[in-house]
Curated annotation (Swiss-Prot):
Transmembrane segments: none
GO annotation, cellular component aspect: cytoplasm; cytosol; nucleus
Modified residue annotations for Phosphoserine: 549
Function according to Swiss-Prot or TrEMBL: Oocyte-specific protein tyrosine kinase that phosphorylates and inhibits cdk1 and acts as a key regulator of meiosis. Required to maintain meiotic arrest in oocytes by phosphorylating cdk1 at 'Tyr-15', which inhibits cdk1 activity and prevents meiotic reentry. Negative regulator of mitosis. Involved in the mitotic DNA replication checkpoint.
Tissue specificity comment: Detected in egg (at protein level). Oocyte-specific maternally supplied protein. Present in immature and mature oocytes and in early (pregastrula) embryos, but not in post-gastrula embryos.
Organism: Xenopus laevis (African clawed frog)
Family: Belongs to the protein kinase superfamily. Ser/Thr protein kinase family. WEE1 subfamily.
Signal peptide bounds: none
Subunit relationships: Interacts with prmt5; this promotes protesomal degradation of wee2-a in the nucleus. The interaction with prmt5 is disrupted upon activation of the DNA replication checkpoint.
Protein name (Swiss-Prot/TrEMBL): Wee1-like protein kinase 2-A
Length: 555
């Protein structure tokens, strides 16, 4: 390709480029430039009408900008008489697009690569997306919440350097050095930063992973939806807050529920927790779906039909919920909001021939399970931060800010819950009727209950929290577990029969041993006329036999 340029009406230079010179120009052309004080510099300053381009250091050039004409190119001396000529500066050639070659394979490949700090976004709905970049926000270890419900011993074990539980007194100096070093190496442990909801926002995981079926509940915190997870096809209960929680006073309540679920884990009488996340500053919690609704729904349906839960089913509810409370209290937590709307029902079909055991852990094999849910008011027994729940089920000592018997507040609320399921009128929120119940008076139950069960319910609402039975005692109460006494009796009889069987086996073994030893002695004796050792019989006459008797006279 040949190109000519004019300078002041005269021909300045004829440029000749060939394909073979293109690659050579990448390495040789950079060092060819006009020197300061040379005739070329005076020509560029005084005679040439083209704009003057400042000189640039060759170190500032990127690999894609190291493009210049061939080094074996020299100006025409015949033209230099009118206008001293020289090859144009590389920036001028780049503007004229004479030396830029962006279509080489190397340059095309370089332009297709993303920059180190860029993000690549994929179009379309895809569950997995590649996002390039440093990811400093996600990799920052200081943005980690500390669960307040984690046992103190567990927290100390996992949050101290080297996992040591206890240091010896003589190692105090070394311990201080280790702590300072650990603070430098692991600042997230010693200078933890609260991971607020706004920092956990992501794309709409709810719409991507779940298919909303219907709304199944609503409360003060938010709404609950029945959803199907697209991946596994199972039903889940998705709880979403009504309003944004980031930065609000309700944020701690939302996080408290997540903390409690994570610590409690899985128990057959506690609603199972799967995951939690934030979208648009709204907290979303994925829990187990209970197909039987709540106990409050059952009570409402019974009131419409003029029915109520019978005593046998009341005992089953009280037993299973007390077992859930036993697990929660054993974990060092209290629920603080036990009521019918927070007790959920799971109905499942039992297979034919499936035997149900009377053990505590085997109650999960029944056809109906009662589970405790809504852990938004859960607090620690040792370090209580009480957030009062429903005032209709609130114990009087909690109102007086006496937190010495926190687990017994759940027992009080459970007693009133069973009374409502038995057909009692709705509970008052205040006034004299509210205080009347706090004096140990059980609400009136329209159905006839057995005296022993009625006495147990009155004990649950006793004004003195010390007199109320703990959840562990309720889970083993003989009134609730009718088969406990019978099972103990049957177990005792079984042990007696096992002992008798063992004695008979010993006697049988001794008899067999004696019979074997008798045969050996008989074989060692010399043969006697008239006796047969095989049958131990006596021959009389020709072929007649008579049994041999060793009995003595007089006996």
């Amino acid at each position: 390709m040949r190109t000519a340029m004019s300078c002041g009406g005269g021909l300045v230079q004829r440029l000749d480029f060939s394909s073979s010179d293109e690659e050579d120009g990448l390495s040789n052309g950079i060092n060819e430039g006009p020197q300061k004080g040379s005739p070329v510099s005076s020509w560029r300053t005084n005679n040439c009408p083209f704009p003057i381009t400042p000189q640039r250091n060759e170190r500032e050039l990127s690999p894609t900008q190291e493009l210049s004409p061939s080094s074996d190119y020299s100006p025409d001396p015949s033209v230099g008489a009118e206008c001293p000529g020289t090859p144009l500066h590389y920036s001028t050639w780049k503007k004229l697009k004479l030396c830029d070659t962006p279509y080489t394979p190397k340059s095309l490949l370089y332009k297709t690569l993303p920059s180190p700090g860029s993000r690549v976004h994929c179009r379309g709905q895809r569950l997995l997306r590649f996002v390039a970049g440093t990811g400093a926000e996600l990799d920052d270890p200081s943005l980690v919440n500390i669960n307040p419900f984690t046992p103190e011993s567990y927290r100390q074990t996992h949050f101290q350097p080297n996992g040591k539980r206890k240091e010896r007194p003589e190692d105090d100096c070394r311990t201080d050095r280790q702590m300072k070093y650990a603070e430098k190496e692991h600042p997230a442990v010693f200078q933890s930063k609260r991971f607020v909801l706004r920092e956990t926002n992501m794309g709409s995981r709810y719409k991507t992973e779940f298919l909303e079926i219907e709304k199944i509940g609503a409360g003060e915190f938010g709404s609950v939806f029945k959803c199907i997870k697209r991946l596994d096809g199972c039903f889940y209960a998705i709880k979403r807050s009504k309003k944004p929680l980031a930065g609000s006073t309700d944020e701690q309540l939302a996080l408290r529920e997540v903390y409690a679920h994570a610590v409690l884990g899985h128990h057959p009488h506690v609603v199972r927790y799967y995951s939690a996340w934030a979208e648009d500053d709204h907290m979303i919690i994925q829990n187990e779906y209970c197909n039987g609704g709540s106990l409050q729904d059952l009570i409402v349906d019974n009131n419409k039909e003029g029915q109520f839960v019978l005593e046998q089913e009341l005992k089953e509810i009280l037993l299973q919920v007390s077992m859930g409370l036993k697990y929660i209290h054993g974990s060092g937590l209290v629920h603080m909001d036990i009521k019918p709307s927070n007790i959920f029902i799971c109905r499942k079909q039992t297979e034919l021939g499936q035997e149900e055991s009377d053990g505590e852990d085997d109650l999960s094999s029944g056809s109906v399970l009662y589970k405790i849910g809504d852990l938004g008011h859960v607090t620690s027994i040792l370090n209580p931060q009480v957030e009062e729940g429903d005032s209709r089920f609130l114990a009087n000592e909690i109102l007086q800010e006496d937190y010495s018997q926190l687990p017994k507040a759940d027992i009080f609320a459970l007693g009133l819950t069973i009374a409502l399921a038995a057909g009692a009128a709705p509970l008052p929120c205040n006034e004299d009727s509210w205080h009347h119940i706090r004096k140990g008076n059980l609400p009136h139950v329209p159905q006839l209950l057995t005296p022993i069960f009625l006495a147990l319910l009155k004990l649950l609402v006793h004004p003195d929290p010390v007199m109320r039975p703990p959840a562990a005692s309720l889970a083993k109460n003989s009134v609730l577990r009718r088969c406990v006494g019978k099972a103990a009796q049957l177990q005792k009889q079984l042990n007696v029969e096992k002992f008798k069987t063992a004695m008979l086996e010993r006697e049988l073994k001794a008899a067999k041993l004696a019979q074997t030893s008798g045969k050996d002695e008989c074989s060692d004796l010399p043969p006697m006329s008239g006796f047969s050792c095989r049958g131990r019989k006596r021959l009389v006459g020709a072929k007649n036999t008579r049994s041999l008797s060793f009995t003595c006279g007089g006996y």
